[in-house]
Structures are given as C-alpha cells and as structure tokens.
C-alpha cells in the first residue's frame, strides 16, 4: 500500500513553489532598479586647488586614480565633477608632485599615504 507522507507534499504543489520564486525575482528586480536610480544620482562637486602651480591634476577613487587636468580660474585651479553620493578620496598632482589640500579633511592609509576625503550628499 502506498501512502502519502508530509515530505511528498511539495511534489504535488509545484505551483506553490513557483510563486515564491516569482516574488523573489520581482524583489531582485526592484533592488536592481533602486540601485540603478541611486547610482544615477550624481551630484555636481567642485574641486579647487588654491596652492598655486603651473599644471594641476586631480586623481581620486572616483576615477580610478587617473589624472584629470584642472582648469585655471584666476589664481586657482578648478574642476566640477558629477560624483555619486558617498565617500571619495582624492589628491592633487601639482607640477609633478603629489600633494593633498591641507585645508580640507584628510585620511591616512595604513601605509602612511595621506589623501583628502570628501562626503558627497544629497
């Protein structure tokens, strides 16, 4: 004699199994859409070097530390970048020498490297 056991219940209710999978998929899809919108909310962020120099570049965690030339504006050098919200590290390359802006917040790595740090907020 064959009898149904509680463990066999899932075999006969395959529709119930699919429902949570669909709900889970929709939840994932929602999370992805929210993340896309969050990353798309870049904020115009001004970087200014006031320490003089002839050639000034900006490098940071927001551009994989590649050199971005700053534009001379009167006695300063300026760049305006659209950055995603969050914390970013950066420093300046002034006439071939890496430096940070002593008038802005800094963070020191375990290796002793000093970078400026900026919080981009809404």
From Swiss-Prot:
Tagged with keyword Zinc: no
Location of region: Glycogen-binding domain: 33-122
InterPro entries: AMPK1_CBM (IPR032640), CRP1_MDG1_kinase (IPR050827), Ig-like_fold (IPR013783), Ig_E-set (IPR014756)
Residues with Phosphothreonine modification: 113
Top-level taxon of the source organism: Eukaryota
GO biological process: fatty acid biosynthetic process
Keyword Phosphoprotein among UniProt keywords: yes
Modification sites for Phosphoserine: 5, 61, 66, 73
Processing and modification events after translation: Phosphorylated when associated with the catalytic subunit (PRKAA1 or PRKAA2). Phosphorylated by ULK1; leading to negatively regulate AMPK activity and suggesting the existence of a regulatory feedback loop between ULK1 and AMPK.
Keyword terms: Fatty acid biosynthesis, Fatty acid metabolism, Lipid biosynthesis, Lipid metabolism, Phosphoprotein
Database matches in Gene3D superfamilies: Immunoglobulins
Family that this chain belongs to: Belongs to the 5'-AMP-activated protein kinase beta subunit family.
Record's function text: Non-catalytic subunit of AMP-activated protein kinase (AMPK), an energy sensor protein kinase that plays a key role in regulating cellular energy metabolism. In response to reduction of intracellular ATP levels, AMPK activates energy-producing pathways and inhibits energy-consuming processes: inhibits protein, carbohydrate and lipid biosynthesis, as well as cell growth and proliferation. AMPK acts via direct phosphorylation of metabolic enzymes, and by longer-term effects via phosphorylation of transcription regulators.
Assembly with partners or alone: AMPK is a heterotrimer of an alpha catalytic subunit (PRKAA1 or PRKAA2), a beta (PRKAB1 or PRKAB2) and a gamma non-catalytic subunits (PRKAG1, PRKAG2 or PRKAG3). Interacts with FNIP1 and FNIP2.
Domain notes: The glycogen-binding domain may target AMPK to glycogen so that other factors like glycogen-bound debranching enzyme or protein phosphatases can directly affect AMPK activity.
Name the UniProt record assigns to this protein: 5'-AMP-activated protein kinase subunit beta-1
Source species: Sus scrofa (Pig)
